[in-house]
Regions:
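Beta1-alpha1 glycine-rich phosphate/pyrophosphate-binding loop at the start
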Residues: 3-57, 143, 148-174
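N-terminal glycine-rich dinucleotide-binding loop that anchors FAD/FMN and/or NAD(P) in oxidoreductases
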Residues: 27, 33-35, 42-69, 130-131, ...
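A Rossmann-like FAD-binding core segment of flavoenzymes
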Residues: 66-86, 91-93, 98-99, 164-249, ...
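A conserved FAD-binding loop/helix module that cradles the flavin
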Residues: 18, 154-156, 267-297
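Short, well-ordered coil/turn residues at beta-beta hairpins
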Residues: 9, 101, 107-109, 114-116, ...
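FAD-site-proximal beta/loop scaffold in flavoenzymes
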Residues: 122-138, 228-278, 286
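FAD-binding core/adjacent interface of flavoenzyme oxidoreductases
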Residues: 1-5, 73-141, 221, 247-255, ...
Length: 297
């Protein structure tokens, strides 16, 4: 079957795009690997009317609603290669199936490169976090930490200090300059130079951070700014232009989420440096409606 649109990725951006194309009565094939970025988090915050909801439950509900449209079909799998051009795209899946369509929406998301610190990975998305607007309120006025991972970490520490007492762990990163230290001090941010050895606490909670010099520092949340990578190389295969941001690559899009390749749209975390469920949904709506209109006009 030659679909009107192929969507690679069935998380918040992809499902939003599928919804609007389906409501435009277009045939849509959604290809999803089933590994959304925020699957590690127990709660999602800041999204209209869904504050505190479990992200996987949100996606399950959204998928069921999209599946109610007769023109949408879902395939569990991974897109491994692509070819063609506008009106004649072909995507090969890891099952060797070839899916064909007139338009292509990329919404396959990103993955995070976490520091190799014992106790960190299992707390990612819960007490090890990256976005204060998504998770910060729940840790208000508690013991907060920021791990120095990039030049942006100083800015992150300045911001996080708005939510509570903050310690900047220089760890093994580059030491900030005198001006940055002065600004951190002005904001009341404590500086800790000893490298981090491990995180400790019950379950997904943090109670303290262990340093290489043997000290245990009380802590309730650790903010990190991990590098990330695109979950698929499909955009490179088609020659979509990229932007190199401090924490990873993103696919270039215009205001309608159109890439530099005719007929290919992109949405969600793969197109922006700032990430949230709300932005991903908005991107998906924009890409879905733009793809639909390109089929009409």
């Amino acid at each position: 079957m030659h679909h009107d649109a192929i969507i690679i990725g069935g998380s918040f951006a992809g499902l939003s795009a599928a919804t609007y194309l389906a409501r435009g009565r277009r045939s849509v094939r959604v290809i999803d690997a089933g590994k959304p970025r925020n699957r590690f988090a127990e709660h999602s915050h800041g999204f209209f009317a869904q504050d505190g909801s479990n992200p996987l439950s949100m996606l399950e509900t959204a998928k069921a609603q999209v599946e109610a449209y007769p023109t949408v079909t879902f395939t569990q799998g991974k897109a491994v290669s692509g070819s063609g051009e506008i009106d004649n795209f072909a995507i090969e899946l890891d099952s060797s199936e070839i899916v064909e369509g007139r338009r292509l929406i990329l919404a396959f998301g990103i993955s995070d490169e976490l520091p190799d610190i014992p106790g960190l990975a299992e707390r990612w998305g819960n007490s090890v976090i990256h976005c204060p607007y998504c998770h910060g309120y729940e840790f208000s006025d508690r013991q907060l930490g920021v791990l120095n991972m990039s030049p942006m970490s100083v800015h992150q520490a300045m911001l996080i200090s708005e939510w509570g007492s903050t310690t900047f762990f220089i760890d093994k990163g580059l030491e900030p300059d005198a001006e940055a230290f002065a600004e951190l001090e002005r904001r009341g941010v404590k500086i800790e130079r000893s490298p981090v050895r491990a995180l400790h606490g019950e379950g997904i909670d943090i109670s303290e951070i262990e340093l290489e010099d043997g000290r245990l520092v009380p802590l309730n949340a650790l903010y990190i700014g991990p590098r990330n990578w695109l979950n698929s190389q499909i955009a490179d295969t088609f020659g979509c232009a990229m932007d190199e941001l401090p924490l990873g690559r993103t696919i270039q899009t215009d205001g309608l989420k159109t890439t530099t390749v005719p007929g290919i749209f992109a949405a969600g975390d793969i197109t922006r440096g700032a990430h949230s469920v709300a932005w991903s949904v908005a991107d998906g709506v924009t890409a879905g409606t733009a793809a639909h209109r390109s089929l009409v006009f």
